[in-house]
């Protein structure tokens, strides 16, 4: 039993530490690097206006239930103000969706660290855990960005 507790604490501690490190580091990325989409943050054609997320993933039914921790390391962005926001605020929110998406992509890779001390079954568990925890957040960021880009284009 003692070994199992050590095993669990090691895995949980690894994830908590990884999430905090990544969360902190992405706040240090200069805004200029988040002004446009790159490889991982580029939206696919079917994502462009956000309707795919609503139709097939029913995102509007569950996205508000996902915990939001983005403001933990820095200034958060009050998302409820976006409906009446000026273009600059919308651009800021779009940039922050890129920051959050990048954070979750990197957090997903955290399972790789668990290969150093886990048996195969636990590595597979951590791989699944990484995706189950981060993919809803990734989807929400992509959905929000697609909708915000649409609003920004309409305003301009």
Model-derived features: positions:
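Residue-level signature of transmembrane alpha-helical entry/exit and packing/kink sites
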Residues: 3, 7-11, 15, 92, ...
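Hydrophobic alpha-helical transmembrane segments of multi-pass integral membrane proteins
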Residues: 14-21, 68, 74, 78, ...
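N-terminal signal-anchor transmembrane alpha helix
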Residues: 6-50
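Transmembrane alpha-helical segments and their cytosolic interface motifs
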Residues: 90-122
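Hydrophobic core segments of alpha-helical transmembrane domains in multi-pass membrane proteins
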Residues: 11, 111-114, 122-133
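Alpha-helical transmembrane segments of multipass membrane proteins
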Residues: 14, 18-26, 107, 133, ...
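Cytosolic/matrix-facing juxtamembrane and C-terminal tails of multi-pass cellular membrane proteins
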Residues: 135-156
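Membrane-proximal soluble regions of multi-pass membrane proteins
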Residues: 31-93, 150, 154
